[in-house]
Amino acid sequence: MLHKMREQVAPYGKKLAMTEGHFAIPGRNRCEVLSTWAAGVAYARILNVQERNGDILDIATLADFFGNRWQVNAIIIPTPIRNNKPYLQPVGWVMMLYRRHVGEEAVSVSYPSDLDVVASRTGNRIFLHVVNTRMDRPIKVNLQVDGMKIVRGKVYEIAEDPEFEITELTPDAFRPREKELTGEEWVFPSASVTAMELECVAEIKD
């Protein structure tokens, strides 16, 4: 779809805005499947597509802002409220994770076929958005940055059972877990979405 949009806007030199970007499930239902972590993983892959096209896509969203019934919202307001507070849907958690950990400039990246990865940078800090598309196994990688050495890093990870559904009773189920990266190897859990910040220094060649 985006490649067609590129062709359409090319003569005008304009950038695009994307709204109402959420999934829509056919039939008379509230799209309950969108409360599962499987939907969160799928949405992360769409966000990666948006990032890869950031040169023409100026602003985008993958959800309606908030609501109390339909699951296409980023925030659900329980109704009746009682003692429960509004909570983020999987798409909301993923959008927040990506927005908080992203660089100013896109950089190219290569990765195994079962991962979906985009990369960006701000100075010597490299940011990775990584989706493990496999629901059945983790994937181990060796991280390398051309011309630079990774000194340390922080990892923000969401990894849950793809069939798990978030509700007002488990509002923080998809809260990212922060971990330290001390080497160049990392294992991405099955069905996970991860944001990484890598502190790097330029390699000095003899």
Regions found by a protein language model. Give the residues of each.
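Flexible loop/turn segments at secondary-structure boundaries
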Residues: 23-28, 66-72, 135-138, 162-166, ...
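Composition- and surface-driven signal marking solvent-exposed, interaction-prone regions
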Residues: 31, 36-39, 75-76, 132, ...
